[in-house]
């Protein structure tokens, strides 16, 4: 195995925590014959333990060794893989190097650990090659990754030669991409040890769809039209969803990533205090072959906050042009985002050479940089009742509409007023607490 791994070219720079290189070193030590049996066995168990951890995190099953090799192939963000993401393989000499590496991976797929097991009196490699995972009834956060990697693993097992292996891997890159950007829908920003922003996958995204959002058809249509244009590579605008709380603004944004993930849409959630990192985040993603929505939830600024200046420069106004594969979508309960004061409205007062009206115009100019603004207003009483009844049907609650409306009226009086959120909370209450089986 050590000889095989040492001959890799394109896939040479494996992740620092990979298991392939340590296992290759173990096999080399065994082949040389100069080893301590107990120490070598302990080293093997250490790597198998890590493999079991990975299998548990991602829900791998059957052949964990094959699953892991497939996982390595879809995780390595090398130049070849990145050029293939969302477009597939292109003609070029690099394909010969790729097929060279894939021939090695195909040999690793069929690597025989039996001699090692017999000599050390172990059977762990046989066990991980015929592994039966414990079925989890609870929600699996990495189900999306698990299903894709296992499907690729099964396809690679059937590949007859390096050409078929090449076709399977590059098709995966075409369909989903590579690395964390290819395997995950959404990300948050964290500070790496070096102090630079790092994209961290969000594994437990909400599985909401537009069919789950009752009402607001015009608003959803405008949002979909803009996003479809963006995903298709046509001109599109930054979007601001504003209006009353609990009306489905954030849910509409979340539904987008579930609808368009397979078409290359990715979402990055960012908070106000991270706006100064926006330029560095954009630098990391601008050359990747995906469409990115930078998502800002509940966006608003108080008079003393200046983070909006970073946002203005990124949206429009800085020297560097915003890349075509990036848009900013924000939600807010405020129409103008930045809190105004009466001093801002004073056209006469001057302080330090700056007219207060100029200050107000600077603040108001932020919202004007969102080319698409969509208003989500509070539903009427009739619309609220319709939302309640539709949600009840979706959840299989067989209750009369009159009864639902009467109870929903009582509920909203004590739970924040009329809104889609209030309706959903009422349905949650009916499902989880109340016993209306005789109604």
Regions found by a protein language model. Name each.
Residues 1-157:
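Intrinsically disordered, low-complexity N-terminal extensions of AAA+/P-loop NTPases
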Residues 135-199:
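Interdomain "pre-motor" coupling segment immediately N-terminal to P-loop NTPase/helicase cores
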Residues 202-228:
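N-terminal pre-Walker A segment at the start of P-loop NTPase domains
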Residues 234-253:
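Walker A/P-loop nucleotide-binding motif
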Residues 259-292, 299-304:
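AAA+/P-loop NTPase substrate/partner-engagement loops
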Residues 302-352:
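Conserved catalytic/switch belt of AAA+ P-loop NTPases
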Residues 349-364, 371-385:
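Conserved AAA+ ATPase "SRH/arginine-finger" region at the nucleotide-binding site
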Residues 373, 377-439:
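C-terminal alpha-helical "lid" subdomain
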